[in-house]
Amino acid sequence: MMLGAEGGEGFVVKVRGLPWSCSADEVQRFFSDCKIQNGAQGIRFIYTREGRPSGEAFVELESEDEVKLALKKDRETMGHRYVEVFKSNNVEMDWVLKHTGPNSPDTANDGFVRLRGLPFGCSKEEIVQFFSGLEIVPNGITLPVDFQGRSTGEAFVQFASQEIAEKALKKHKERIGHRYIEIFKSSRAEVRTHYDPPRKLMAMQRPGPYDRPGAGRGYNSIGRGAGFERMRRGAYGGGYGGYDDYNGYNDGYGFGSDRFGRDLNYCFSGMSDHRYGDGGSTFQSTTGHCVHMRGLPYRATENDIYNFFSPLNPVRVHIEIGPDGRVTGEADVEFATHEDAVAAMSKDKANMQHRYVELFLNSTAGASGGAYEHRYVELFLNSTAGASGGAYGSQMMGGMGLSNQSSYGGPASQQLSGGYGGGYGGQSSMSGYDQVLQENSSDFQSNIA
């Protein structure tokens, strides 16, 4: 029997596959035939631990009849993406919202947006002009550059309020010069994740004794270039307070700014249980749908990789750095869905600049994948697909998360890495919480009661 919305299961659906820049208004329009409880307040977006939108949301409806209407929207499109709609309940929604997203529930409402696809050499003044009429906080624009001092084609912008940031999102796909600009929701947590390293790691400017080539094969170390890479996750002057202004100055304990006022510190990614290749490099996936690239031109940038996979829209790109501080010619690319990751494999042997990138597919559906040998392998896929509402790429045992970790260095490198935290920390996908919920639903029910 369906219980009322005040207690018990309620009238909730879960939505998956939303565009990254999706707003509450767009979700309301998508469900225009349904009565959403409290309007926009009844739409609860799910965020990654970095504060990025996960492409999923819960929608609270007014009755069981409205739930049935909402479920009929399953597989309809929003923009160029089809959206999946599943039946859910208050128990699942409350648990997921509590265990996902950055620590502060308000960090996704602090006025940040992320821009992608900026023209080379784009200045902060051009961004101010692009957002003409929308108030940006002082020192609120940051143009990250890569380790070679070149623009990544991205920017973080903080507006005076979340309402203004929502207006900024409506400029998605408008142009600066000849380039159209993609705009995504962001947060202070995302900025800190990418730019604010633990201070005690800043001294590790050279690779440690275990950061040598080959240490990753079956070796339980952080892996290739860990000291250098974590050192590179500088600076913003101790976090948020040190954003560089329009003129440029030393930002604090990182590399500082260049003469254009651009931050010279840039982080490509964090750590994870996914270990690829000979050096044991690490990459943290928030979706569980990753493509590993090898054979890239050494001058390739993140923007080059985004363009390589066009018209697909990767969620994130991580370019690997070796223990000598140089690029390895490898990268990890994260996609929103298993389907996108599989579609990316069509780029097998496609050219990037003067080099072609070869392909190797290691994709599993509902089971952990083995490591395959192939002499032409240069592009790896680590992506798992489960049934609707099921766990993606995760197995649970006694409440401990054992992530499906695909290793590409041979049998010796295959390891199981557990992650604890209500069964969530060790999962390789945002959708992995479904399986945990099933195993612990009785506990959640008793806690709520």
UniProtKB/Swiss-Prot annotation:
Entry keyword set: Acetylation, Isopeptide bond, Methylation, mRNA processing, mRNA splicing, Nucleus, Phosphoprotein, Repeat, Ribonucleoprotein, RNA-binding, Spliceosome, Ubl conjugation
Region of interest (2 X 16 AA Gly-rich approximate repeats), residue spans: 234-433
Sequence repeat locations: 234-249, 354-372, 374-392, 418-433
Residues the record lists as Dimethylated arginine modifications: 233
Residue positions, PTM Phosphoserine: 23, 54, 63, 310
Modified residues (Phosphotyrosine): 246
Domain RRM: 11-90, 111-188, 289-364
Gene3D superfamilies, alphabetized: 3.30.70.330
One MF term in the entry's GO annotations: RNA binding
Major location category of this protein: nucleus
Assembly, per entry: Part of a ternary complex containing FUBP2, PTBP1, PTBP2 and HNRNPH1. Identified in the spliceosome C complex. Interacts with IGF2BP1. Interacts with CUGBP1; the interaction is RNA-dependent. Interacts with MBNL1; the interaction in RNA-independent.
Protein's name in the database: Heterogeneous nuclear ribonucleoprotein H
Species of the source: Mus musculus
